[in-house]
C-alpha cells in the first residue's frame, strides 16, 4: 500500500514538472525577442479604401515589434481560395492571420477550423450567423446606415414626401451591407420617401448592374466605398440625372467627391483603428497564452462639406490619405 502511494506521488510530481516545463516553454516562445509574423489576407488591398487600414497595421507592427505580411491576389474569388492562401502562409511560419472574409457558410466553418492552429481576426465584413464564434473588428453597420439616413432627414427637415430613393452596393450578400440597408430603411419609415430600387453591382444572377440603367431617383444612397466612388463619378459626369448622393466610404476618392460637391454626406469608418487593433489583439494573444481575444467595434464619422476639414477630423483625413 505504501509502495503504491509512493508511486502515485512520484507520478504526480513528474506530471507537475511536465506541466511547468510546457507552460515555461510556451511563455518563453511567446515572450521571446523574435518578432511574430502576421499574415493579412485581403483580396483588394491595393484599393485606396484600405490605405488607413494598412497604416494602422504598420503603426501597430512597429509598436509591438511584429512583422506584417500583406497578401492580395486578383484570383482570390472564393472562400476556398482564401483558406488555401492562409494555409500556405501558416506553413511558411505565420503566427496569426488577419482576413477580410469572402463571407459564406462554408468559409465561416473553415475559418473556425483554421483558428485551432493560429489566432484569427476577421475584418471588413461578418458572417450571417450570429454569433459566428470568430473574433471581429468592425463598425456598427446598422447604426452607420441609420445615421446616414438621419442626416438625409435633417437636410430635408424631416419631410421626404414624394422623394424617390435608390440604394446601391457592391455585393448583395455582404452582411455589412445588409445591416447598413436595414438601418437606412428603419430610419426612413414614415418619412414619405419611396425606395424605388435597391441593386448590387455583383449579385447571384451575374447580371451586369450599373447606375445609368436604373430608374431615375432624387437620392442615391451608396452603402460601401466602391459604390460611393462609382456614384460620385456618375454624379460628376451628370449620369445621376440630378440625384443627390449620400453614402459610406473611406478613401481619398470618396473624400474628393464630397469636397467637390458631388456628394452631400459621407459616413467614414475609422479603418486606421481597425488595422491597429487587429494587430494588437493578435499580439496580445500570441504573447499571453491565457489572454482571451475580444471583438472590437471601431468608430465612424459623419462627414459633410461643412465639417470635412474641421480640426476634429484632421486625424481621420490624415490616415485616409496615407
Language model segments and positions:
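Hydrophobic membrane-insertion alpha-helices, especially the h-region
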Residues: 10-25
Amino acid at each position: 500500500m505504501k509502495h503504491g502511494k509512493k508511486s502515485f506521488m512520484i507520478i504526480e510530481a513528474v506530471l507537475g514538472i511536465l506541466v511547468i516545463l510546457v507552460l515555461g516553454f510556451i511563455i518563453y516562445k511567446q515572450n521571446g525577442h523574435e518578432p511574430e509574423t502576421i499574415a493579412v489576407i485581403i483580396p483588394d488591398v491595393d484599393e485606396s479604401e484600405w490605405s488607413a487600414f494598412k497604416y494602422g497595421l504598420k503603426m501597430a507592427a512597429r509598436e509591438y515589434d511584429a512583422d506584417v505580411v500583406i497578401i492580395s491576389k486578383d484570383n482570390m474569388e472564393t472562400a476556398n481560395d482564401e483558406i488555401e492562401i492562409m494555409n500556405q502562409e501558416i506553413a511558411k511560419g505565420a503566427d496569426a492571420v488577419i482576413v477580410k472574409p469572402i463571407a459564406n457558410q462554408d468559409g465561416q466553418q473553415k475559418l473556425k477550423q483554421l483558428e485551432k492552429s493560429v489566432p484569427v481576426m476577421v475584418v471588413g465584413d461578418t458572417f450571417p450567423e450570429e454569433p459566428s464564434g470568430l473574433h471581429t473588428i468592425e463598425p456598427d453597420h446598422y447604426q452607420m446606415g441609420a445615421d446616414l439616413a438621419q442626416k438625409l432627414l435633417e437636410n430635408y427637415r424631416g419631410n421626404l414626401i414624394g422623394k424617390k430613393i435608390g440604394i446601391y452596393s457592391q455585393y448583395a450578400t455582404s452582411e455589412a451591407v445588409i445591416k447598413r440597408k436595414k438601418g437606412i430603411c428603419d430610419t426612413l419609415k414614415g418619412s414619405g420617401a419611396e425606395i424605388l430600387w435597391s441593386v448590387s453591382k455583383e449579385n447571384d444572377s451575374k447580371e451586369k448592374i450599373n447606375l445609368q440603367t436604373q430608374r431615375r431617383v432624387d437620392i442615391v444612397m451608396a452603402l460601401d466605398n466602391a459604390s460611393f466612388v462609382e456614384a460620385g463619378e456618375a454624379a460628376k459626369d451628370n449620369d445621376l440625372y440630378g440625384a443627390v448622393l449620400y453614402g459610406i466610404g473611406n478613401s481619398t476618392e470618396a473624400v474628393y467627391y464630397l469636397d467637390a460637391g458631388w456628394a452631400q454626406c459621407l459616413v467614414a469608418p475609422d479603418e486606421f483603428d481597425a488595422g491597429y487593433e487587429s494587430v494588437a489583439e493578435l499580439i496580445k494573444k500570441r504573447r499571453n497564452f491565457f489572454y482571451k481575444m475580444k471583438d472590437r467595434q471601431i468608430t465612424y464619422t459623419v462627414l459633410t462639406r461643412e465639417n470635412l476639414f474641421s480640426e476634429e477630423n484632421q486625424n481621420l483625413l490624415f490616415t485616409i490619405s496615407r
